[in-house]
């Protein structure tokens, strides 16, 4: 007879960017009248019973829905859907020694082949001990966490002997469906991984710029990920390029560009070169040039901002130095007037207009990237009122600042605030002006990359950017 699982939500702090109170239905689901939870308690307090399973369901922290939310019919992860399913992340603690695929399939009522696909995609993580609940977790969640991490329980775990609790709480990917799970092992299952359908539309061999003994240079298509997502390492540039070239050893990432950007990416063939290239990037020995299609002209010269040191979008930048914020610099080498992309080109490439009216002209900027912060070019150009065409995340904020310059608390016309609470509210209001991350392409290309290595100069250029392509020649029609 299958073992019972008791519901538990919100165990993992890193899944939430901002504190969100658990929806009311979670409290109902975890009430003491739940027969599922009563079985959980009985098993935990029975001297002969093994550690019970704690199943955590976090479909989406902000969704107001009944506890019995309707999920799609699960079969296989392929073929790839064109749209992502709503987020669904499940947290489990093994009740007894188990096989990963069997335990997940039974606990979440998922087909074993679907679970095996999730594991192949890198969407399943484990830790020897369940992580600490976030501060906003419900008391019931905290109670169950304490029960499964009781010192008297942990001291019987052979796998964690010699480890600190913090070490035992470190998560790793499950890589084998038949991986054995010791009783008490924690699992995080991303049931609906982020998908990248564009991967299946690309002629990957045609995107390869160069192949050497140490690396491959790829002209990365937009709407793809260089190395994959937290819950999907399968649909990525490294995997599809490796397959296209027939490589026995998969390529490795050396640096990143945004999913919505296109252009030059260096993928390493060996761990040694990967380490060398990382070192060259740290020492600023790798030169990167970009082309950006902006809504207005940008003056040549160096542009400096300071970026908030918080690792989530949107990336906020300030014209004034703020202690602890990271310096961001780029040099505008050239800016020329070009035709605004035609409606056909924008339709072919699925460019979001973001509510920005079509113009007669756009402006193509050649940029020398002096520092390499995430979203740096996009955030800096938006901050000076010249956002990148199609950038739904930052263009909406730029439009808001054009209408009301004082809305940006870090801009030139930012207000003085009487209290920290007032400033915090202004920052949240400014964040809310930003849109969602683009799902397709924006007017940004990593056009050139170069470096010196072992006495040789290496330099590569990407192809024609999408906004200059003839729609008839596009491979997307």
UniProtKB/Swiss-Prot annotation:
The record lists its disulfide bonds as none
Which BP terms from GO are recorded? Answer: enzyme-directed rRNA pseudouridine synthesis
> CDD domains, alphabetically?
PseudoU_synth_RluA_like (cd02869)
Gene Ontology CC annotations of this record: chloroplast
| Residue ranges of every copy of the S4 RNA-binding domain listed in the record | 98-205
**SUPFAM superfamilies found in the cross-reference section:** Pseudouridine synthase (SSF55120)
The top EC class is isomerase
Q: Which reaction does it catalyse?
A: a uridine in RNA = a pseudouridine in RNA
The active site is formed by 258
User: Which keywords accompany this UniProt record?
Assistant: Chloroplast, Isomerase, Plastid, RNA-binding, Transit peptide
Q: What family, per the record?
A: Belongs to the pseudouridine synthase RluA family.
What is this protein's name?
Answer: RNA pseudouridine synthase 6, chloroplastic
Protein species of origin = Oryza sativa subsp. japonica (Rice)
């Amino acid at each position: 007879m299958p073992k019972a699982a008791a519901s538990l939500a919100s165990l993992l702090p890193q899944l939430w960017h901002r504190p969100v109170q658990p929806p009311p239905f979670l409290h109902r689901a975890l009430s003491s009248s739940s027969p599922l939870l009563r079985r959980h308690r009985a098993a935990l307090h029975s001297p002969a019973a093994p550690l019970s399973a704690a199943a955590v369901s976090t479909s989406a922290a902000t969704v107001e829905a009944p506890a019995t939310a309707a999920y799609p019919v699960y079969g296989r992860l392929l073929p790839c859907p064109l749209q992502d399913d709503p987020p669904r992340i499940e947290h489990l603690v093994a009740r007894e020694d188990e096989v990963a695929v069997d335990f997940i399939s039974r606990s979440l009522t998922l087909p074993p082949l679907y679970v095996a696909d999730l594991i192949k995609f890198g969407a399943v993580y484990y830790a020897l001990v369940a992580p600490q609940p976030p501060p906003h977790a419900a008391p019931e969640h905290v109670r169950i966490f304490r029960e499964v991490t009781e010192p008297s329980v942990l001291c019987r775990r052979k796998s964690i002997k010699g480890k600190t609790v913090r070490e035992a709480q470190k998560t790793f990917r499950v890589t084998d469906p038949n991986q054995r799970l010791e009783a008490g092992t924690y699992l995080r299952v991303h049931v609906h991984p982020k998908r990248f359908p564009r991967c299946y539309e690309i002629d990957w061999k045609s995107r390869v710029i160069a192949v050497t003994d140490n690396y491959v240079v790829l002209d990365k298509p937009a709407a793809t990920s260089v190395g994959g997502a937290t819950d999907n390492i399968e649909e990525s540039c490294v995997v599809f390029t490796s397959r296209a070239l027939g490589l026995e050893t998969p390529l490795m990432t050396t640096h990143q560009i945004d999913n919505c950007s296109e252009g030059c990416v260096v993928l390493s063939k060996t761990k040694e070169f990967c380490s060398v290239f990382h070192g060259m990037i740290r020492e600023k020995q790798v030169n990167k040039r970009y082309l950006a299609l902006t809504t207005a002209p940008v003056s040549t010269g160096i542009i400096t901002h300071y970026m908030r040191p918080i690792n989530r979008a949107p990336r906020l930048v300030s014209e004034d130095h703020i202690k602890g914020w990271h310096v961001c610099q780029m040099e505008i080498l050239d800016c020329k007037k070009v035709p605004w992309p035609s409606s056909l080109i924008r339709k072919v490439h699925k460019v979001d207009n973001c509510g920005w009216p079509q113009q007669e002209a756009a402006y193509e900027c050649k940029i020398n990237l002096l520092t390499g912060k995430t979203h740096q070019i996009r955030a800096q150009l938006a901050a000076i009122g010249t956002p990148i065409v199609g950038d739904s995340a930052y263009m909406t904020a730029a439009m808001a600042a054009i209408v009301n310059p004082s809305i940006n608390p870090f801009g030139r016309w930012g207000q003085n605030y009487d209290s920290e609470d007032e400033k915090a509210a202004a920052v949240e209001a400014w964040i809310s002006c930003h849109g969602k991350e683009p799902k397709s392409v924006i007017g940004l290309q990593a056009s050139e990359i170069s470096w010196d290595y072992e006495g040789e100069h290496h330099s590569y250029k990407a192809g024609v950017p999408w906004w200059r392509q003839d729609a008839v020649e596009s491979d997307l029609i």
